[in-house]
């Protein structure tokens, strides 16, 4: 301990910076020199659970947050699952961090008082929406409402996560996104009572979008206009009960998607993709179809998880339209189909010139999970092993022993 205390204050603060806030604060009892040293640490995390005594922590934050020495707070993270916290206190703390030019702000708040009385939602201060220093903002929890004022300016915000929050009206999210000129990473987990019917995401600068969609949510439609996007994750986007507009994304390199209908419109938007993960749940009559002329000339890695046994038509099209494919991983997770109208694809190619180009030129890894020894599956596996001239590894397994990566 004497050796550590002999270090200069600047180095001690750097060491404290790497520790959890609770441990950082506990160093204040070591000696008079250490008593206020923790106030120079620019990164703070407070975690309160419903089974803990919250009032001492509230008083501690209120008293000491304004005493912090750094001119810039690098990160303020508050995680609170409690009925004793007052939204006014959290709002005050946010105002204080904003006055210290906070760069990362994470508020995870759930008021557990809804179990026995109406919840008072946390309405964050207007100054949050004009914070010029903010680079990362994450708002998480059913007890937070996003009420965006008319004056918005977040010129440095690059990462935004909105998880299970409510919006004051239909325009709040659209207005917020409109004034984030350098936003690169956006995650939206919706709540079924979030007050948004048509979710509009128009962000020219966006590079990554994660938008899980649950069928239980009330929604009329989605509009996604993100021309610079490189990574797209949208499970459950294509459902029959809402409309959507998804514009072309010429820079997409990786996509992780669930498909329930309208494969064609989806594929038209992501033809530049290099790595594609698809969870497919299609009716028999929709099982294959996207029009000729859609090619995945850059696709190298395909993960295909199909929750139907009528998987072959879609797969043969993807093989034919992906000439550079190197890795093919398939999971078939569904009951056998006994529909007489369904016709399986023939995997017997008499003319080698009609064999998909990726098999002859590039495929190196092949994995098939959910194998049940049906004739079509045997024909398909034999077809791959026969024609994949550059295959380096292959795996055929039952579903129970396979994890798709």
From Swiss-Prot:
UniProt domain F-box: residue ranges: 1-47
CDD domains attached to this UniProt entry: F-box_AtFBL13-like
Organism of derivation: Arabidopsis thaliana (Mouse-ear cress)
Full protein name: FBD-associated F-box protein At2g26860
SUPFAM superfamilies the UniProt entry points to: F-box domain, RNI-like
InterPro entries in alphabetical order: F-box-like_dom_sf, F-box_AtFBL13-like, F-box_dom, FBD, FBL13/AtMIF1-like, LRR_dom_sf, LRR_FXL15/At3g58940/PEG3-like
Transmembrane segments: none
Any Pfam family the entry gives: FBD
């Amino acid at each position: 301990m004497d050796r550590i205390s002999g270090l200069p204050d600047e180095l001690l603060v750097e060491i404290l910076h790497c520790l959890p806030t609770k441990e950082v604060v506990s160093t204040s009892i070591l000696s008079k020199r250490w008593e206020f040293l923790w106030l120079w640490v620019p990164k703070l995390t407070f975690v309160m659970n419903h089974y803990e005594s919250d009032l001492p922590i509230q008083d501690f934050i209120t008293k000491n947050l304004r005493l912090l020495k750094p001119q810039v707070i690098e990160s303020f993270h508050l995680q609170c699952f409690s009925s004793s916290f007052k939204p006014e206190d959290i709002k005050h703390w946010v105002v204080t961090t904003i006055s210290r030019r906070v760069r990362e702000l994470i508020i995870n708040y759930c008021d557990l008082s809804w179990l026995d009385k109406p919840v008072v939602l946390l309405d964050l201060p207007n100054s949050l929406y004009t914070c010029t220093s903010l680079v990362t903002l994450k708002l998480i929890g059913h007890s937070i409402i996003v009420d965006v004022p008319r004056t918005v300016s977040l010129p440095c915000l690059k990462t935004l996560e909105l998880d299970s929050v409510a919006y004051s009206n239909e325009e709040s999210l659209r207005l917020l996104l409109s004034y984030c000129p350098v936003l690169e990473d956006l995650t939206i987990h919706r709540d079924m009572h979030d007050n948004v019917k048509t979710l509009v995401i128009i962000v020219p600068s966006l590079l990554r979008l994660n938008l899980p969609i649950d069928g239980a949510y009330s929604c009329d439609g989605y509009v996604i206009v993100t021309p610079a996007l490189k990574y797209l994750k949208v499970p459950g986007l294509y459902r029959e009960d809402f409309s959507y507009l998804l514009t072309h994304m010429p820079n997409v390199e990786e996509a992780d998607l669930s498909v329930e209908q309208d494969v064609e419109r989806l594929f038209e938007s992501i033809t530049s993709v290099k790595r594609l993960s698809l969870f497919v749940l299609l009716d028999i009559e929709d099982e294959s179809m996207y029009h000729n002329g859609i090619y995945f000339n850059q696709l190298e890695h395909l993960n295909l998880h199909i929750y139907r046994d009528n998987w072959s038509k879609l797969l043969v099209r993807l093989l034919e339209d992906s000439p550079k494919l190197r890795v093919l991983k398939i999971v078939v997770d569904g009951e056998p189909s006994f529909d007489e109208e369904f016709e399986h694809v023939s995997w017997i190619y008499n003319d080698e010139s009609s064999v998909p180009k990726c098999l002859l030129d590039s495929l190196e890894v092949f994995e098939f999970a959910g194998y049940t020894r049906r004739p079509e599956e045997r024909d398909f596996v034999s077809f791959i092993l026969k024609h994949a001239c550059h295959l380096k590894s292959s795996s055929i397994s039952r579903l129970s022993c396979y994890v798709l990566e």
